[in-house]
């Protein structure tokens, strides 16, 4: 990955609210299935904004920090996804998205961020991200002192 796109907590909340507004009316949804781990925080934000209390997870492992690897399903939510929103933080190459579509063919699959290779696999997303860009999510970063450039 050649570029980095840094996401702040404020940005994430703004994007999640935009997505939630597009998912109204909330009564059409039975619940949310958050893709662990990237979809957990966006899933909580959507649950809050839409007033949805039924939240489940599908646990899929496909990254080791910044390296993509083979997909492993560790835990899945029951059913075919009918009436459910499935949320992940982003769709990248589409590997996870294909697995989600296979597991939950009737779900409404959404992400906050989408790269070109994965865009056709989601029903909705908020922000376009170039394919060669790594996204730094706020839950992966800490706040630290940065000395002034002048050194004084």
Curated annotation (Swiss-Prot):
Binding-site positions, 5-phospho-alpha-D-ribose 1-diphosphate: 37-38, 69, 88-96
Subcellular location: Cell inner membrane
Enzyme class per UniProt: transferase
Binding site for guanine: 92, 135
List of residues binding xanthine: 92, 135
Binding-site residues, Mg(2+): 89
An example Gene Ontology molecular-function term: hypoxanthine phosphoribosyltransferase activity
Gene3D superfamilies hit by this protein: 3.40.50.2020
Catalysed conversion reaction: GMP + diphosphate = guanine + 5-phospho-alpha-D-ribose 1-diphosphate; XMP + diphosphate = xanthine + 5-phospho-alpha-D-ribose 1-diphosphate; IMP + diphosphate = hypoxanthine + 5-phospho-alpha-D-ribose 1-diphosphate
Keywords in alphabetical order: Cell inner membrane, Cell membrane, Glycosyltransferase, Magnesium, Membrane, Metal-binding, Purine salvage, Transferase
Range of residues in the leader sequence: none
Binding site for GMP: 69, 92-96, 134-135
Its membrane topology: Peripheral membrane protein
PANTHER family per the UniProt record, alphabetical: XANTHINE PHOSPHORIBOSYLTRANSFERASE, XANTHINE-GUANINE PHOSPHORIBOSYLTRANSFERASE
NCBIfam families: PRK09177.1
Similarity remark: Belongs to the purine/pyrimidine phosphoribosyltransferase family. XGPT subfamily.
Quaternary structure, from the entry: Homotetramer.
HAMAP family: XGPRT
Annotated protein name in UniProt: Xanthine-guanine phosphoribosyltransferase
Gene: gpt
